[in-house]
């Protein structure tokens, strides 16, 4: 018989129940016991869904109140010493303080979990870190599930991945040196799990899909030789990429089974066909929302079944944490877009797909002929749908002129033409894009969406806000203005709603971090722009002022990265389609007299593949898609872009290759350190380094901004330096926004006068 198991389940509930309960708890509106009871009910529901789908085990230990890597920091005693908490007796309040900070300590840093849109809390390791086992989190969930009558498989992230994902703090050392102390702690935790009578323990080592240094790889043999002494079978789970290059190492590890991601890396299967133990085949996509073609999946699984027999397990490619909970609640989508609805599968539907596969493998395809037929019909309909495939778009992409993604003239010539008409002072000041979104603005948008506010009233509300934003910027004497983006709820959703080829769910939420969930748009078909999206707002804003108004768009790579993307054509093609659609908007803005246009790309770096060898290909198509988004603009139109991340050094040639006339970046928190990289690289175009951190309501002093600007002037020629905040101001309040910008403008004017002498 084939074994079915799940690597992990979403934690937040079908309708984000956990999120709302957490937030009420933080506001002191919910008692701790009520939060614990709700969490227990969610776990029981998750286990029941797995059991009802004929899973041979329910997975435990995957549920968390905030983050599974934070749970592991508690379980190994590796919580940051700076908090002064004891990991053995940590209260729920203290747990949340680690994640969210308190009056004395800032929160543990957060970063992306591999190349997903989930964020984990980064372990802080010090030379003198001492570990201490605390298996309570896992043991309690095992007992709870067993009490409900389930067969249980706990999951824990492995020691090498855990250590790799952390950062060294304090005195310089190599965190790898902590491994020999960490492994006995893991052994202690696993022993406690085995003592609960579990047959299998799943240990996740996704770091194996990265370019790990040789000493880390070499350590796997010794680490797992020690852990294998535990009185339970170990399933080593890899995901997010191929581990074929480590096949010899993995086959030699003294574990009892291996999980492979055959969705992300189907080609790796050939390297493991002679694997002598349990092989868990990750065949249902744990990261996207499309139904699988089950006949095709069986074409892969049936030969494996013949070879492995009882040793074949089936599973999703990775944890289902990255997919929404249940498609069945999307009644609106089913009504408005029944065709698309039939092509989708959320977590519960993916579990049901695995159940069908298990039945087919155990009793033959005829036992599930109806389900397989339904799956095939949906796959065929999707392959041939004219809702998805539009000949004119394929034609447009195919017929792009040879240098479509190149400006007419080099930057040195363009900037002269731009400066001539812009006539800006030295160190021009501007904003990144958004201004504070008041409750009134949010209410007006929501009421308009629900049909409770007429179009005329909605437009009047937006225009009133735009005028307010323009007047405030004039009073502050900023040089290049923005319209403030009052009409936008989200920088990707706004454009997705106005582009063809996108759809939206109502409950398609996935966890980003803690209680924060995101609802990515669904890119299901060829992308076009039926009509202008931003032109009237920018044009209206420009009509209110003699100053220069900047148009604001989200770039193609960010739209791609923050969406669920169709899987029937390459991501690179989807990205180019978005770029070409945006170029129509850019040219319309230019025609409307908006000749400074910002195309935001905060997610270019996030899209980098896990392995360095794949970077160039990605950066090439991402760069091309970005340049296509402004194809055809005149030399005197100034293209800006904005990016916010802390690491540029390794991708600077690609950033320069975007050929934006001005790039604004987030630099205030790193004390302008980033700029040195731009200077060393001799970055050729204009730069606007952020001079204050918008993530804090704190108003910077004139001295702080002056210090940052003087540092910037040391490495960037004054003629090429812009002055701006780190990021958009959407989440700030008006009071601090005005005060922050006032300081920024005053300091700039002071330095301007000094430089003019």
UniProtKB/Swiss-Prot annotation:
Signal peptide stretch: none
Keyword Amino-acid biosynthesis: yes
This enzyme's EC code(s): 2.1.1.14
Binding, L-methionine: 432-434, 485, 600
Cofactor(s) needed for function: Zn(2+)
Keywords in alphabetical order: Amino-acid biosynthesis, Metal-binding, Methionine biosynthesis, Methyltransferase, Repeat, Transferase, Zinc
Catalysed reaction, written as an equation: 5-methyltetrahydropteroyltri-L-glutamate + L-homocysteine = tetrahydropteroyltri-L-glutamate + L-methionine
Function comment: Catalyzes the transfer of a methyl group from 5-methyltetrahydrofolate to homocysteine resulting in methionine formation.
Name of the protein in question: 5-methyltetrahydropteroyltriglutamate--homocysteine methyltransferase
Organism the protein comes from: Actinobacillus pleuropneumoniae serotype 3 (strain JL03)
Gene that encodes it: metE
């Amino acid at each position: 018989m084939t074994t079915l198991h799940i690597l992990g389940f979403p934690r937040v509930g079908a309708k984000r129940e956990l999120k709302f309960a957490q937030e009420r708890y933080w506001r002191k509106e919910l008692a701790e016991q009520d939060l614990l009871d709700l969490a227990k009910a969610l776990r029981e529901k998750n286990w029941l869904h797995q059991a009802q789908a004929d899973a041979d085990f329910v997975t435990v230990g995957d549920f968390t109140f905030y983050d599974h890597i934070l749970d592991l920091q508690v379980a190994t005693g590796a919580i940051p010493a700076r908090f002064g908490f004891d990991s053995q007796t940590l209260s729920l309040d203290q747990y949340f303080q680690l994640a969210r900070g308190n009056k004395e300590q800032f929160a543990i840093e957060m970063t992306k979990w591999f190349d997903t849109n989930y964020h984990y809390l980064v372990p802080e390791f010090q030379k003198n870190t001492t570990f201490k086992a605390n298996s309570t989190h896992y043991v309690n969930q095992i007992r709870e599930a067993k009490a409900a009558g389930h067969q249980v498989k706990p999951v824990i992230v492995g020691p090498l991945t855990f250590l790799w994902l952390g950062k060294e703090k304090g005195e310089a050392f190599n965190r790898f040196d902590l491994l020999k102390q960490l492994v006995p702690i893991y052994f202690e935790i696993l022993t406690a799990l085995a003592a609960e009578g579990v047959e299998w323990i799943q240990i996740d080592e996704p770091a194996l899909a990265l370019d790990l240094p040789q000493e880390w790889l070499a350590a796997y043999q010794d680490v797992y030789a020690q852990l294998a002494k535990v009185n339970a079978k170990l399933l080593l789970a890899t995901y997010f990429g191929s581990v074929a290059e480590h096949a010899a190492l993995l086959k030699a590890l003294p574990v009892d089974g291996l999980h492979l991601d055959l969705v992300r890396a189907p080609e790796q299967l050939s390297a493991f066909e002679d694997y002598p133990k349990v092989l868990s085949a990750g065949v249902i996509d744990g990261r996207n929302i499309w139904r699988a073609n089950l006949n095709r999946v069986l074409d892969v699984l049936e030969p494996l079944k013949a070879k492995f027999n009882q040793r074949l397990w089936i599973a999703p490619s990775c944890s289902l944490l990255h997919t929404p909970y249940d498609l069945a609640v999307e009644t609106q989508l089913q009504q408005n877009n029944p065709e698309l609805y039939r092509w989708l599968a959320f977590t519960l539907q993916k579990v049901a797909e695995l159940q069908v596969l298990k039945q087919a493998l155990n009793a033959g395809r005829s036992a599930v002929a109806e389900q397989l037929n339904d799956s095939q019909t949906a796959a065929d309909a999707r392959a041939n749908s004219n809702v998805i495939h539009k000949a004119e778009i394929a034609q447009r992409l195919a017929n792009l002129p040879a240098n479509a993604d190149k400006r007419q003239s080099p930057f040195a010539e363009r900037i002269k033409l731009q400066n001539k008409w812009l006539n800006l002072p030295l160190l021009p000041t501007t904003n990144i894009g958004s201004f504070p979104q008041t409750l009134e603005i949010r209410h007006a948008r929501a009421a308009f969406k629900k049909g409770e506010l007429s179009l005329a009233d909605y437009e009047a509300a937006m225009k009133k806000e735009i005028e307010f934003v323009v007047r405030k910027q004039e009073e502050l004497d900023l040089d290049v203005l923005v319209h403030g983006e009052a009409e936008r709820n989200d920088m990707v959703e706004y454009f997705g709603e106005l582009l063809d080829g996108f759809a939206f769910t109502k409950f398609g939420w996935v966890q980003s971090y803690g209680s924060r969930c995101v609802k990515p748009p669904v890119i299901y078909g060829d992308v076009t722009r039926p009509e202008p999206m931003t032109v009237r707002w920018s044009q209206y804003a420009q009509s209110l002022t003699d100053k220069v108004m900047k148009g604001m768009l989200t770039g193609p790579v960010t739209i791609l990265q923050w969406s669920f993307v169709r899987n029937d054509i390459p991501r690179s093609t989807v990205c180019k389609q978005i770029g070409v659609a945006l170029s129509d908007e850019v040219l319309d803005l230019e025609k409307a007299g908006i000749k400074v246009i910002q195309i935001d790309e905060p997610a270019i770096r996030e899209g980098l593949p896990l392995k360095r060898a794949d970077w160039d290909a990605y950066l090439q198509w991402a760069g091309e898609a970005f340049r296509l988004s402004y194809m055809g603009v005149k030399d005197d139109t100034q293209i800006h872009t904005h990016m916010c991340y802390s690491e540029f050094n390794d991708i600077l040639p690609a950033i320069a290759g975007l050929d934006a006339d001005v790039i604004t970046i987030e630099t205030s928190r790193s004390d302008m350190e980033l700029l040195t990289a731009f200077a060393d690289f001799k970055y050729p175009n204009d730069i606007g380094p952020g001079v204050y951190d918008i993530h804090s309501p704190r108003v910077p002093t004139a001295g702080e901004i002056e210090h940052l600007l003087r540092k910037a002037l040391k490495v960037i020629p004054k003629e090429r330096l812009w002055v701006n905040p780190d990021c958009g101001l959407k989440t700030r309040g008006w009071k601090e926004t005005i005060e922050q910008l006032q300081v920024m403008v005053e300091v700039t004017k002071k330095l301007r006068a000094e430089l003019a002498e």
